[in-house]
Amino acid sequence: MDEQIFLMGGNPPIKNHTIVNKIVSSSMIERIVIFTIFRDNWQPYMKKYTEVFQSHFPNLNTDYLLLDTEQIDFDSYLDADVIIIGGGNTEKYIATYVNQNFKNYIKHMLNKGAKVIGFSAGALLLGEKVYVSPNDNSDHQIKIKNGLGLFSQFLISVHYDSWNDKANKDRAEELVNVPIIPLNDHSCLVLDKLGNIIEKID
């Protein structure tokens, strides 16, 4: 199976060339669609997601979509080669993007061969269940939430090193009956479109 889902443990830009090469090597990338949520000064931050691809594909088209503030006609974005789901407030991302319409769009695009890259919150919400670290919510509690269900045999934790999240992850693992795979800030878990692990890049 091809490498199509890339779960990034941290924030952009992608610094590891091995990861970049896996994304860009197998296909011509003409259009990237980035799903994010509104926050002050969000626009300048967007180039962190795309700069690494811009250098490979100078004629790249990029769209930035904020599902929390606008209605999206997904049919307008069926020619995307890469879909990026950004990072930020995990619970807000879950509230915005975990719904049947978005799930249908992502699954359709995976079946068409598009690559899906999730950063931090955007990686977490792709799982069937989502581990929200106490470092990642204002209640400072471990939370297990529902996600989009692109993978189900495991959960992930993000920012594992910078959040020093081992004890929290181990406690959360007792609440779910599958392993939680820790991802450091610069790590990437690579899956096929069915959610099977192909490799972990640290």
Where are the model-predicted features located?
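N-terminal beta1-alpha1 cap of cysteine-dependent amidohydrolase-like domains
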Residues: 1-82
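Short, surface-exposed connector motifs at secondary-structure boundaries
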Residues: 29-33, 88-89, 152
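Structural motif
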Residues: 7, 82-86, 117-118, 155-156
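Active-site-adjacent pocket-lining segments in enzyme domains
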Residues: 79, 94-115, 122-202
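Short, flexible loop segments at the rims of nucleotide/cofactor-binding pockets, characterized by
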Residues: 9-13, 61-65, 93-96, 135, ...
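Short, glycine/serine-rich, charged loops/turns that create anion-binding
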Residues: 12, 39, 89, 123, ...
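Non-catalytic interaction surface on structured domains
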Residues: 35-39, 63-76, 85-114
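Glycine-centered flexibility sites
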Residues: 9, 87-88, 118, 122, ...
